[in-house]
Design a protein with these regions (language model features):
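C-terminal charged capping/lid subdomain of soluble metabolic enzymes
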Residues: 278-420
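A short, small-residue-rich loop immediately preceding and capping a beta-strand
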Residues: 66-91, 95-104
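Solvent-exposed alpha-helices and their adjacent loops that cap or buttress functional pockets
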Residues: 5, 65-71, 92, 125-130, ...
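Gly/Ser/Thr-rich loops at beta-strand to alpha-helix junctions
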Residues: 15-21, 80-86, 107
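Non-transmembrane, aqueous-exposed alpha-helical and coiled segments at domain scale
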Residues: 39, 48-73, 106, 225-228, ...
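ATP/NTP phosphate-donor binding region
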Residues: 4-75
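A glycine/threonine-rich phosphate-anchoring loop and its flanking beta-alpha core
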Residues: 90-192
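A conserved active-site cap/scaffold subdomain adjacent to cofactor or substrate pockets
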Residues: 187-201, 205-277
Length: 420
């Protein structure tokens, strides 16, 4: 996209904070390059801008008005981070055009994604849109962003560790094969990007190169794969459950997705440690199949775990990955037959929970449930919800099918556990 060569006018979309940080400079740069820059759309800094359908409609309506005034398809340029990007992304889709984004914080992996998480009547849904055609970061600006935003991005990128392990599990079970190209986009640079937590907390621009690249590549991988599997696993469902419960919504700014994901990541790393302490190659498959509940029993358990519409949602999602006794036998035989290779891949992928908790803490990200207003008991209670919440197959499902799930959760929260 070259706005100058296309002769299309542009509209900078920002809030008062991001306008001061970068929006004003972007607007001036457009004008000095000979681009027709419409009067910018700048939202108030307070109250904190919310990713709501109404706010997206405000942007789309402004674009339609400007289209009529200029006789051209005005190009929206989002200047900001998650909320500004998501709102502009949806507005651009509504008016049928591409957009550009100038990122102001390394706060999440959604810059290059095609989805926009938007609140519609109090329910968060991911709207399928079109990814931006251009993404620009100035690392000096990114490094100067509020540290809480950097910590959020660090937590979001950290999720790729257990999320990747869950994909390995799903591949071994024959449910969702690994795409090696997409896998490399996400995983090849994750460890390096997460290796400088102290420098990130200090605001060293050089350290931000890897973090920004990792977040951008994660979004691109989701585009290529046409789904979120490359960038998330069960750890994200902890965050989703807590978002539905409005955990941290009363903070200013509200508790970010990345902060909640950081705790979900540690919960899953701790679970994986206990899971790998056991030898799945020695699993008594006959006993596991004999103990496997029928669907009616599973549905009853789901409805005792969730309430209302969320229970209906979880039933629908879990039904997709549920198998009967014969299907379970075939699945477990497949996983056990490949367990030596799968275990080696998991051990290469994963990081010890205590080690990673220290990295998160040094980056300024949450490392204890109390950091996000929860208790260890709250996290424990979220495990069954995270298992049932989505149809995506994860280690929680395999542990349940092996008959280990309840014991492993108990071990995670034993007296010698990560948070006890």
């Amino acid at each position: 996209m070259c706005i100058r060569d296309s002769n299309l006018p542009a509209l900078v979309v920002a809030d008062e904070r991001t306008w001061a940080v970068a929006g004003k400079a972007v607007d001036a740069g457009l004008r000095s390059a000979g681009v027709v820059a419409c009067d910018p759309l700048v939202f108030p800094a307070e109250p904190c801008l919310y990713a709501s359908l109404d706010n997206a409609h405000t942007i789309a309506d402004r674009l339609r008005t400007l289209d009529a005034e200029t006789g051209s398809a005005v190009v929206p340029i989002a200047v900001g981070s998650g909320t500004i990007n998501d709102l502009t992304k949806l507005a651009a889709k509504d008016v049928g055009r591409r957009y550009a984004v100038v990122g102001t914080a390394a706060s999440m992996d959604g810059y290059t994604g095609a989805g926009a998480p938007i609140s519609d009547n109090g329910v968060k849904v991911t709207m399928q849109c079109v990814a931006p055609q251009v993404v620009i970061f100035d690392l000096d600006i990114t490094a100067a962003a509020p540290q809480v935003m950097t910590a959020s991005g660090y937590g979001d990128l950290a999720a790729k560790i257990p999320g990747g392990a869950d994909w390995i599990i799903a591949d071994a079970a024959g449910i969702e094969p690994l795409d090696q190209h997409v896998w490399a986009l996400v995983q090849s640079g994750v460890r390096d990007a997460l290796s400088r937590p102290d420098d990130l907390r200090r605001g060293d621009p050089e350290a931000f190169s890897g973090l920004v690249e990792g977040l951008i590549l994660s979004g691109l991988a989701m585009q290529v794969y046409d789904g979120t599997r490359p960038a998330s696993g069960a750890e994200h469902y902890f965050s989703h459950i807590w978002e539905l419960a409005h955990v941290g919504a009363d903070r200013n700014p509200p508790l970010s997705h990345g902060h909640k994901v950081a705790i979900g990541t540690l919960a899953m790393l701790a679970f994986y440690e206990k899971f790998l302490d056991r030898d799945l190659s020695r699993l008594d498959i006959d006993a596991a199949v004999a103990a496997w509940p029928d669907w009616r029993t599973v549905e009853s358990d789901i409805r005792s775990t969730f309430e209302g519409a969320l229970a209906d949602h979880a039933v629908k999602e879990t039904k997709v990955k549920y198998v009967d006794a014969d299907g379970l036998r075939a699945r477990l035989n497949r996983v056990v037959d490949r367990w030596h290779e799968t275990r080696a891949a998991l051990e290469k992928q994963l990081v010890r929970a205590r080690v990673f908790a220290d990295q998160l803490r040094r980056a300024g990200a949450p490392s204890r449930p109390e950091d996000i207003g929860l208790t260890a008991a709250d996290v424990r209670a979220t495990f069954p919800k995270a298992m049932y919440y989505r149809s995506r197959y994860t280690v929680l499902d395999l542990a349940r099918e092996a008959g280990w799930y309840e014991e492993l959760v108990e071990e995670v929260f034993a007296p010698d556990g990560l948070w006890t």
